């Protein structure tokens, strides 16, 4: 079975070697047909503590690392202006 890969925005980087990634998806309401944004948060493993809040990253499903972490950060897709300002 292939590993799932998702793209999302980092909302928290406070944990040691852990980031919380918010993944949004769009679904159609079953009755009214309106497109609705749904989101889910995933705890992901960041070995080098290199990822900061506000950045867009890709995460990959992996074997359980801890109670909450079953995802790991693959790479950084883009850096937001908020994260750039925090670095300066």
Swiss-Prot record:
GO terms for molecular function: rRNA binding; structural constituent of ribosome. CDD domains: Ribosomal_uS17 (cd00364). It holds the Pfam family Ribosomal_S17. Keywords: Ribonucleoprotein, Ribosomal protein, RNA-binding, rRNA-binding. GO terms for biological process: translation. GO terms for cellular component: cytosolic small ribosomal subunit. InterPro entries: NA-bd_OB-fold, Ribosomal_uS17, Ribosomal_uS17_bact/chlr. Signal peptide: none annotated. One of the primary rRNA binding proteins, it binds specifically to the 5'-end of 16S ribosomal RNA. Belongs to the universal ribosomal protein uS17 family. Part of the 30S ribosomal subunit. This is Small ribosomal subunit protein uS17. It comes from Sphingopyxis alaskensis (strain DSM 13593 / LMG 18877 / RB2256).
